[in-house]
Amino acid sequence: MSDKFNKIYDQSISNPEKFWEEAANDIFWFKKPTKILNKSNPPFYKWYEDGITNTCYNALDIHIDQGNGKRTALIYDSPITGNKSKFSYEELRSKVSIFAGALKDQGVNKGDRVIIYMPMIPEAVVAMLACARIGAIHSVVFGGFASNELASRIDDSKAKVLVTASCGFEPGRTVEYKPLVDEAIKLANHKIDKMILFQRSGHEVKLSDPKEVSWEEVVSKANEVD
């Protein structure tokens, strides 16, 4: 194993352009790149700049296209709540496609930034893949992080939308996310356009600002994004 790894590593160092040209063949491209590495403006190198792909398509759709849609794509197993669930590629793509439509309904377009401030639940994965599906850039912030830290990430990313949940569960305690998010929004110089909040069962919170919308509501009105 170590010899194989060392050989691959050496190849990546000795001829990185050739190495990553071959690696690119392992994923799906809508348009294969002909320019592998642009070194004209160091240190701002550009990889695959004329290629077109989609990471959500590579994570989900390609497996469905290959006849594996019924296979398990995601397993959720919470040691805190004891909840367990599985999602096939088809089921996960459906959830992702609908939430991608919900993001677009909230004004999120290609290149826009979305902060994901959530516990480790399936909806966090859905949100990440939905951003990738429409070409938005997501920034994951650890759920429960202090308000000032979240505020700095709002300012750094200039996020248009923040996706969060009503709370997170940790050993021996429940962390209410909404007060932390509210304070972060007050502290941040950059102001988000919308907050999408997923209501966790039994721990629902009141949404009081026009900028605040529930995950359940936006999903119910959204169309899937192919």
What spans do the regions from the language model cover?
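N-lobe entry segment of adenylate-forming
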Residues: 1-87, 91-94, 98, 180, ...
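Conserved AMP-binding/adenylate-forming core of the ANL superfamily
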Residues: 56, 74-129, 146, 150, ...
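Generic, well-ordered alpha-helical scaffold segments in large soluble proteins
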Residues: 63, 95, 99-102, 106, ...
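Structural core segment of the AMP-binding/adenylate-forming
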Residues: 133-217
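A local structural motif
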Residues: 137, 224-226
